[in-house]
Amino acid sequence: MQAEELYVALNSSEATEAGLDLMFNGDSNGSGGFADASLNGTSKIIGSKTAASTLAGSATTKAKFDNMIIDFATNVVPNWGSDAGVGQAGAISSPDGASTYHINAQGQEIDQLFFKGLIGAFTLDQIVNNYIHPNQLDSGSRIDDNDNDVLSGDNNYTDMEHKWDEGFGYLLSLIHI
């Protein structure tokens, strides 16, 4: 899954801005930069679905994710082997020494901010503002078609059922992250 590979990359001292950006935003060929070749060249691009609704603030939100990629690649990665300090990116250990965290100069662990931010900017935005929004569910003849069990093409579901299934698919995908 693309998100899993991007998470691994945001925990790697080998990550580059170009590589992370390709995984998040894709390029003219679609998705790219993933070790699993089946994830490359698709129209499924994490960045294109992040803060993708037309609500005010969406562009600002998307830019925050792009800036986190830049921060990680230009500040965290170069200081991977250094100890973090006040105003200094680097590594910090848990109190018991069992875990090491790589933080930016503000003490933020970018991978955690990035992926917890995606819960809202990607998952919630897709569910609420795209799939189960009244503009989707109530558009055209969907209400009547659903009430009268009019199936979508050759499928065994109505258009409205499909929108609900897509929305919950985004929610349940969080189980794998």
Residue ranges and their predicted role:
Residues 1-175:
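Mature extracytoplasmic or organellar-lumen-exposed domains after removal of signal/transit peptides
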